């Protein structure tokens, strides 16, 4: 198992991801954004959080044009698994690999806290180790996490079982129907605003993210 963790200018969660996979005993490698190909034998691509290119224009809008993203798009179209966390989710949306858009938080503030989440679907490789309706406690940290999609797109998400996680209780950013994470129709590309890599050890206050990464890595 080889995992490619992408790194853009402004990415700041890449070493958290490497540490998380090390805890699971899985090999992972950083891949610089200027690379034109993914490493041979890549089984999973992770686009971690941060502020790629300073979030100028829109979060993820510039990173989408980095050379490595063409390789990621090809990889995803061939059925490869891709996980985008926070800024990674934004990059996946900007790249057209996931539907919808991520807008400024409704309260116009950066939000950083532990957040309760509900598992909506486990019929996918990302959440297969969780039970439907299970409550998770995973940190969020973002200013542009307000997920939006039009009425037709929302209906398609529901019909295709693409809504995987929702915020439980308080909606921290105004996301439509409290959506926290969605996947593509093929269930091979998943984007979420919460940070599972920050919920890997008891010392961090939660281990609820561990099963997500373990399910992908093992």
Curated annotation (Swiss-Prot):
User: Locate the Glutamine amidotransferase type-1 domain: which residues?
Assistant: 2-218
Q: Which GO terms describe its molecular function?
A: ATP binding; glutaminase activity; phosphoribosylformylglycinamidine synthase activity
The record, for CDD domains, names: GATase1_FGAR_AT
For this protein, the record's PANTHER family field holds:
PHOSPHORIBOSYLFORMYLGLYCINAMIDINE SYNTHASE SUBUNIT PURQ
The task this protein performs is described as:
Part of the phosphoribosylformylglycinamidine synthase complex involved in the purines biosynthetic pathway. Catalyzes the ATP-dependent conversion of formylglycinamide ribonucleotide (FGAR) and glutamine to yield formylglycinamidine ribonucleotide (FGAM) and glutamate. The FGAM synthase complex is composed of three subunits. PurQ produces an ammonia molecule by converting glutamine to glutamate. PurL transfers the ammonia molecule to FGAR to form FGAM in an ATP-dependent manner.
What pathway does this protein act in?
A: Purine metabolism; IMP biosynthesis via de novo pathway; 5-amino-1-(5-phospho-D-ribosyl)imidazole from N(2)-formyl-N(1)-(5-phospho-D-ribosyl)glycinamide: step 1/2
Q: Which Pfam families match?
A: GATase_5 (PF13507)
Gene designation: purQ
Check the record and name the SUPFAM superfamilies matching this protein: Class I glutamine amidotransferase-like
Q: Can you say where in the cell this protein is located?
A: Cytoplasm
**Protein name per its UniProtKB record:** Phosphoribosylformylglycinamidine synthase subunit PurQ
Record HAMAP family = PurQ
Where are the active-site residues found? Answer: 86 (nucleophile), 195, 197
Q: How is the subunit organization of this protein annotated in UniProt?
A: Part of the FGAM synthase complex composed of 1 PurL, 1 PurQ and 2 PurS subunits.
Give the main localization category: cytoplasm
The organism named in the record is: Wolinella succinogenes (strain ATCC 29543 / DSM 1740 / CCUG 13145 / JCM 31913 / LMG 7466 / NCTC 11488 / FDC 602W)
Q: Which reaction does it catalyse?
A: N(2)-formyl-N(1)-(5-phospho-beta-D-ribosyl)glycinamide + L-glutamine + ATP + H2O = 2-formamido-N(1)-(5-O-phospho-beta-D-ribosyl)acetamidine + L-glutamate + ADP + phosphate + H(+); L-glutamine + H2O = L-glutamate + NH4(+)
> Which keywords, in A-to-Z order, does the entry hold?
ATP-binding, Cytoplasm, Glutamine amidotransferase, Hydrolase, Ligase, Nucleotide-binding, Purine biosynthesis
> Its GO CC terms?
cytoplasm
Q: Which GO terms describe its biological process?
A: 'de novo' IMP biosynthetic process
Q: Which Enzyme Commission number(s) are listed?
A: 6.3.5.3, 3.5.1.2
Q: Which InterPro entries match?
A: Class_I_gatase-like, PRibForGlyAmidine_synth_PurQ
Tell me the SMART domains matching this sequence.
GATase_5
């Amino acid at each position: 198992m080889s995992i490619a963790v992408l790194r853009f200018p402004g990415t700041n969660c890449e070493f958290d991801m490497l540490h998380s996979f090390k805890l699971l005993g899985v090999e992972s490698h950083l891949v610089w954004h200027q690379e034109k190909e993914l490493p041979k034998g890549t089984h999973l691509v992770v686009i971690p959080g941060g502020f790629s290119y300073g979030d100028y224009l829109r979060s993820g809008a510039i990173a989408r044009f980095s050379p490595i993203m063409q390789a990621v798009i090809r990889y995803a179209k061939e059925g490869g698994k891709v996980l985008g966390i926070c800024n990674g989710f934004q990059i996946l949306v900007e790249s057209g690999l996931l539907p919808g858009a991520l807008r400024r938080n409704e309260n116009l503030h950066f939000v950083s806290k532990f957040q309760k989440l509900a598992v909506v679907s486990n019929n996918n490789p990302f959440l297969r180790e969780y039970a439907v309706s299970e409550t998770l406690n995973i940190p969020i940290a973002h200013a542009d996490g307000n997920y939006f999609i039009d009425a037709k797109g929302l209906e398609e998400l529901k019909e295709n079982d693409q809504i995987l996680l929702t915020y439980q209780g308080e909606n921290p950013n105004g996301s439509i129907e409290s959506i926290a994470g969605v996947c593509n129709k093929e269930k091979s590309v998943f984007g979420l605003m919460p940070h599972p890599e920050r919920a890997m050890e008891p010392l961090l206050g939660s281990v609820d993210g561990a099963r997500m990464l373990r399910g992908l890595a093992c």
